[in-house]
């Protein structure tokens, strides 16, 4: 009886670890450049939240132009 219980316990551990690995997969960060000039922080955040359903955005300097980039979890 203990042999079957040990095999079952090992199987359950592998199953739980496999499920945990599947949930973390696909959580890479994707980026989208929305505005290519004249970035305003509040507008950038609003546009990113509307387009990507709650994901934030930020302004960054792209050469001599302020651009808006959105960061969001990639969908696989």
UniProtKB/Swiss-Prot annotation:
A GO BP term here is: killing of cells of another organism
Q: Which residues cross the membrane?
A: none
Record has Protease as a keyword: no
Which cystines does this chain contain? 30-74, 39-59, 44-68, 48-70
Q: Does the keyword NADP apply?
A: no
Task: Report the main location listed first in the record.
Answer: secreted
The entry's localization annotation reads: Secreted
The domain of life is: Eukaryota
Q: Which InterPro entries match?
A: DEFL
Which Pfam families does the UniProt record give? SLR1-BP
Task: Tell me the keywords, alphabetical order.
Answer: Antimicrobial, Disulfide bond, Fungicide, Plant defense, Secreted, Signal
Record-stated family = Belongs to the DEFL family.
Tell me the protein's name. Answer: Putative defensin-like protein 121
Q: What is the lineage of its organism?
A: Eukaryota, Viridiplantae, Streptophyta, Embryophyta, Tracheophyta
Q: Which gene encodes it?
A: LCR55
